[in-house]
Amino acid sequence: MKVSRRKFIKAQAVASAAAAAGISIPISASNVVTDSSLTKITWEKAPCRFCGTGCSVNVGTKEGKVVATHGDIKSPVNRGLNCVKGYFLSKIMYGKDRLTQPLLRMTDGKFDKNGEFSPISWDQAFDIMAEKWKKTLKEKGPEAIGMFGSGQWTIYDGYAASKLMKAGFRSNNLEPNARHCMASAVVGFIRTFGIDEPMGCYDDIEAADAFVLWGSNMVEMHPILWTRVTDRRLSVPGVKVSVLSTFEHRSFELADIPIIFTPQSDLAILNFIANYIITNDKVNKDFTSKHVNFRRGTTDIGYGLRPEHPLQQAAKNPDSGDSTPMTFEEFKAFVSEYTVEKASEISGVKPDKLIELAELYANPETKVVSFWTMGFNQHTRGVWCNNLVYNIHLLTGKISTPGNSPFSLTGQPSACGTAREVGTFAHRLPADLVVTNPEHRKIAEKIWKLPDGTIPGKVGAHAVLQSRMLKDGKINAYWIQVNNNLQAGANINEETLPGYRNPDNFIVVSEAYPTVTSQAADLVLPTAMWVEKEGGFGNAERRTQLWHQMVEAPGESKPDLWQLMEFSKRFKTDEVWPKELLDSNPDYKGKTLFDVLFINGNVNKYPLDDLAEGTLNDESNYYGFYVHKGLFEEYAEFGRGHGHDLAPFDMYHETRGLRWPVVDGKETLWRYREGSDPYVKEGAGFEFYGKPDGKAIIFALPYEPAAESPDEEYDMWLSTGRVIEHWHSGSMTQRVPELYKAYPDAQVFMHPDDAKSRGLRRGDAVKVMSRRGEIITRVETRGRNKPPIGLVFVPWFDASQLINKVTLDATDPLSKQTDFKKCAVKIVKA
């Protein structure tokens, strides 16, 4: 069968359009792209490597390389579409400067922290790592080692890292970079519902009458979901979109209710909406009386800075997440002070706009989806913002039904599936278990076949605290995988770089390319990427997706999972576990951590025969058993029967993912609702079963100011973020020629009047300066981002312009998530 280029392109367009419309796909269109008889290309499915949307792509390989990708028509998430980054997935692994062998800083053949990077073998790399880890463990104990992972870790990577750190090394100093992006969402879910992750799903988009974006530029950060929102808005009369942000961006192009507000004032707007609902008698009293409790939150909780910082010293209740019961009438009185006039004064938004927004929520006939990402979460009161938007949905009963959903969008491909569900945070274990709960630790120890008391009960150091402890010499052995924290962390010159270069510390970075972080490391380990290994991600709608390895990694690059497992062989329990633990459990004496953690009868349970025929799998072939299946099935034990049920491993390779809980082979679209969620009891209607009484909580939480605001010297707000062309720090996308050319350099976006008043013109070189640092960049007064007077926006993908030299390392005191959206700067001509 021969197909012309014209017919090929036409068929592909027909297929995508048909899938987007939800109609059947012509056979010729559905098969033409992946018909290997035409191209000699082998096609397999995998989730996209980039954001948390969880698009599925078809990956084409030929002669051992990924040569093409296209949107997976069979995927219910993206329906054959890709964003601009997704279209160039095939190129992310083939940058000219790909790392292919371990590199150690050396002088005259020996390790030297100030030496030059020199190639070494994997054995040599693990030898020096083990030497440094053992020295640190012996001298200072497990709290002096740490690991910083990622929401881009596969499920297997994160799970193995958690076992190695929390059970093997008995240290809870394990964190993902998702601390920077999703931690406030997590704590918000836990406080309100007692269980993590959204109750709704993407199907809500096709059922909603209104969409409200709180600090979310979906058109650039979640473009495939935005196509679905756009389709709903343009094809169904009466559907409305409201976009709230501190500056105008591309999502405003579709906004019926555009709102630009003063940074931090979203707290006041949210409380006003609750007040509006109550004063206009729009509370769903039947729902709230049956399914809601009210509590007053502790206030004046500080800003997550170092204890000696004046703002921390001044806080009355630093880091407190406590709350006390209150009645509906008391809650009504609390929000009554948030009148439209007060909210307008604090936010700078005209009263009529605020009322128009509030009416979307108040009207019982309007089904509303609230979307948010970093604008809410990267916020010194991010947890409160999450709680307050839930207040609105709970007051109106607009929750857990099709088209009614408060929906926290995820930034990374497995911030949900790995960081949150696997539990790679310093306080967590899988399936919402926590290290501070003795019963939870016992569950983990039983599943992992470990002695009672193996897992420590003390919460480890969170991401920002890890950087501070490295600087202060309290963490001395540190392993970083799948992130670029020296570019991505806040206040990097003062709080991050000093710890990496502290002569008492040994820093290991597993990376695919040279980055700002790897340049500051002592040892760099070359890492396999994406489909160079078998993997699994979990997206924002609780959809777990797995993929097979499709190509080999270049040179000596190895999967992160292999690195973790192989490193565990270098330690015996006698070297890392306390004597009393081993004396009471002598069967564990003399065993390696590899034996204890990965040859435990669970992980090594499945033979190589279980591998799909013709499938590559470097780790499994190396170890002689199906590593990934064993890890997955052991991990799944945590959630089955506890509201986090995963399907059997093989089922995921037969589908485009499943949304948990998966019970009796059926996924769950809407949690907490009878008839949709198998955990809701018959007759309950709704049941928020993460709480002991099955009721969600509405919190009374006030507006409180930002940690740092503009003043006479530093007279402008700075907000940072991303652009559609680049992923996070740009270490992958800047190596794709088409994406680099589309957006090669960062700029400072500012209002034309602000530029004019400073004698600046578009294209001028300027310094963006804060109390902490400065960068040189160029002025942009046009284009996609249009800040109001008094605010500037700088994207952070550009390693030549490290804007996080400038940002403040203030965090939400409850979630420990950094606020990258608000600090004070000045702009001066360079």
From Swiss-Prot:
Localization: Periplasm
Catalytic activity: 2 Fe(II)-[cytochrome] + nitrate + 2 H(+) = 2 Fe(III)-[cytochrome] + nitrite + H2O
Names of the cofactor(s): [4Fe-4S] cluster; Mo-bis(molybdopterin guanine dinucleotide)
Signal peptide: 1-31
Name of the gene: napA2
Protein name: Periplasmic nitrate reductase 2
Organism lineage: Bacteria, Pseudomonadati, Pseudomonadota, Gammaproteobacteria, Vibrionales
Disulfide bond residue pairs: none
Chain positions recorded as Mo-bis(molybdopterin guanine dinucleotide) binding sites: 85, 152, 177, 181, 245-249, 264-266, 374, 378, 484, 510-511, 533, 560, 720-729, 804, 821
Gene3D superfamilies: 2.40.40.20, 3.30.200.210, 3.40.50.740, Dimethylsulfoxide Reductase, domain 2 (3.40.228.10)
SMART domains associated with the record: Molybdop_Fe4S4
Stored InterPro entries: Asp_de-COase-like_dom_sf, CT_Nitrate-R-NapA-like, MoPterin_dinucl-bd_dom, Mopterin_OxRdtase, Mopterin_OxRdtase_4Fe-4S_dom, MopterinOxRdtase_cofactor_BS, Periplasm_NO3_reductase_lsu, Prok_molybdopt-oxidoreductase
Assigned keywords, A-Z: 4Fe-4S, Electron transport, Iron, Iron-sulfur, Metal-binding, Molybdenum, Nitrate assimilation, Oxidoreductase, Periplasm, Signal, Transport
Cofactor stoichiometry and binding remark: Binds 1 [4Fe-4S] cluster.
Native source species: Photobacterium profundum (strain SS9)
Gene Ontology cellular component terms for the protein in this record: membrane; nitrate reductase complex; periplasmic space
Transmembrane residue ranges: none
Chain sites annotated for binding [4Fe-4S] cluster: C48, C51, C55, C83
Pfam families in the cross-refs: Molybdop_Fe4S4 (PF04879), Molybdopterin (PF00384), Molydop_binding (PF01568)
GO molecular function: 4 iron, 4 sulfur cluster binding; electron transfer activity; iron ion binding; molybdenum ion binding; molybdopterin cofactor binding; nitrate reductase (cytochrome) activity
Signal recorded as keyword: yes
Similarity comment text for this entry: Belongs to the prokaryotic molybdopterin-containing oxidoreductase family. NasA/NapA/NarB subfamily.
Subunit structure: Component of the periplasmic nitrate reductase NapAB complex composed of NapA and NapB.
Example GO BP: Mo-molybdopterin cofactor biosynthetic process
UniProt: substrate binding residues: W796
